[in-house]
Each structure stands twice: as C-alpha cells, then as structure tokens.
Amino acid sequence: KFIYFNQGDAAWNSSGYGIRAAGCGPTSMAVCISTLTGKWVTPVDTTSWAYEQGYYSSAGSEHRAIPAMAEHWGLKCDGLGTNYQKIKESLKHGRPVVSLMGSGYFTRGGHFMVLTEIDSNDNVTVADVGSRKRSQYKYSLHDVISQSKVASAGGPFWSIYKQGKAKTQNDSK
C-alpha cells in the first residue's frame, strides 16, 4: 500500500514554502520515500531539504530535484524518459514512477505526481498529490505518457526504488 500525501493539506502549508501552490515535486517524493523506506518523511521534510539545496522555490522544483531527493534518502532513481516499456516494467516490479505532467487530465501547466501500479490492460493507478479525486481513477499509460512534459535529468518519468529489489506491499499480493 502506498502512503499518500496531498500538497494542499493544511499540515504542510504553515511552513512558508508554498507547498499547496508549487510543492508537487517534493510531495511526490515524500510519497515514494515514505512508502519505500517505511520512514515518515513528510512534504515539509522534502520541500525544506530541496529548498536548502537550491532545487526548490515558490515557482516549483527543478527536474534534478527528483534524483537528488532519492539519493539523499538512500534510494535509487532511474530516469526513464518516455520509454513505455521501461515505465511498465518499473511498475510491474513494484517501483513507483514519479512523472512530470504537462497540459491534459492532471494540469494546465506542469505537475509532478506518482504512478503506483499498472494492471494487465496497461492502465495505471496514480497518487496525484494535487487531487485525491484524480487519484481514485485509472488512466491509460499511453495517455499519461502523451500528456507528460519535456524534462531534463532523465525525466519526465523516474523510477524510484531501494538498492536491490524494490519491495512494497504490492509484492505480497
């Protein structure tokens, strides 16, 4: 089971970092870090670290923040570009995939979220850190890739995992 954080929750928004408006990258990484490590790492933890390292401002996160946060919290990060097969394989192995979305279902501008699972029809479940409602549906992986935004640092899709085999509770199903 994936831990879900929403960037709009009041608990994160007295920090002064503008998480509600621009904290989707660090919030997405808080989902991955907390899920994979079993440690309670909140959006405030990831945003403050990214800010201190120069990866985050009130305008949002730099793309290189994703691999940097993974490394800081002891995780691995593989940039997948927009490679359909690599994204699918990562999800099949229980590895969450952080995605940077462009205009479409999820945003009008740019928005980070997490792909958490894929079914036999190649529909993905998402942890959209900006919308609990959008997190309740499945989306065609093809559509998600087609709505991604051009990104640097190996993006717009990044596989996040532990050294060795990623193990989430999905592996025991």
Segments and roles (model prediction):
Residues 118-173:
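Noncatalytic regulatory segments and standalone regulatory/sensor domains
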Residues 21, 25-33, 43-47, 63-70, ...:
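Extracytoplasmic/secreted envelope proteins and their assembly/folding machinery
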Residues 76-133:
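Active-site-adjacent substructure of cysteine-protease-like catalytic cores
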Residues 3, 96-98, 112-114, 156-162:
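Ordered hydrophobic segments in well-structured contexts
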Residues 49, 53, 69, 90, ...:
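Residues that form generic nucleotide/phosphate-binding pockets
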Residues 48-82:
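Mid-length scaffold segments of soluble, non-membrane domains
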Residues 58-66, 106-111, 134-136:
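Extracytoplasmic/secreted cell-surface and envelope-processing proteins
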Residues 1-55, 138, 165, 170-173:
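Active-site-adjacent structural segments surrounding the nucleophilic cysteine of cysteine proteases
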